[in-house]
């Protein structure tokens, strides 16, 4: 909800003409996402691509830029809406950042206090997120960090490593 209010205030798509396309997101990530979407919908090799630059090792590109499970939703995305997909994905990931931090705080502090939601929001809308949210592939790490810490705490305290291994 907070992100939607910011979108309205700043005129960011779908409430205006502005987008998250900045620096590398415009020059690199959007073409990578478009190529990945094309490969998913038209069946192409995920090993190599002649359509990016002068040809690239697509498996290496996938490993660094596209390996997020969220990116497989591109198979449902029409070709002309890849940039919009990326914008919605950023909003989704920022929301999941707040949710994972709130979950961590709830389990770590053993409370259901309403204030935990605020700290989840603070985490999701931190300065780092404001400055680097266009680095879409790194947002998964910000989502997983509280879960990794919680998993590590459970591993050390209780000898249970399932969450740590999954995160």
Give names to the regions the model predicted.
Residues 102-124:
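Transmembrane-helix signature of polytopic, membrane-embedded enzymes
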Residues 148-163:
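Membrane-interface transmembrane helices that cradle and orient dolichyl/undecaprenyl
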Residues 128, 135-136, 159-167:
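Transmembrane helices and adjacent periplasmic/lumenal helix-loop junctions
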Residues 74, 102-106, 153, 157:
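Membrane-water interface at transmembrane helix exits
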Residues 2-101, 121-143:
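Membrane-interface coil-to-helix junctions
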Residues 88, 117-121, 162-166:
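Hydrophobic alpha-helical transmembrane segments
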């Amino acid at each position: 909800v907070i992100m939607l209010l910011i979108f309205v205030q700043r005129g960011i798509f779908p409430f205006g003409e502005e987008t998250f396309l900045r620096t590398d997101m415009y020059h690199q990530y959007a073409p990578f996402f478009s190529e990945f979407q094309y490969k998913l919908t038209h069946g192409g090799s995920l090993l190599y691509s002649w359509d990016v630059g002068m040809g690239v090792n697509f498996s290496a590109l996938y490993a660094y830029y596209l390996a997020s499970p969220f990116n497989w939703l591109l198979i449902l995305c029409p070709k002309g809406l890849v940039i919009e997909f990326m914008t919605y994905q950023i909003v989704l990931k920022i929301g999941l950042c707040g949710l994972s931090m709130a979950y961590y705080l709830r389990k770590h502090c053993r409370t259901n206090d309403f204030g935990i939601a605020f700290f989840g929001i603070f985490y999701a809308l931190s300065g780092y997120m404001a400055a680097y949210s266009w680095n879409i592939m790194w947002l998964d790490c910000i989502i997983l960090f509280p879960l990794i810490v919680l998993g590590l705490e459970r591993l050390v305290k209780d000898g249970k490593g399932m969450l740590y291994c999954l995160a």
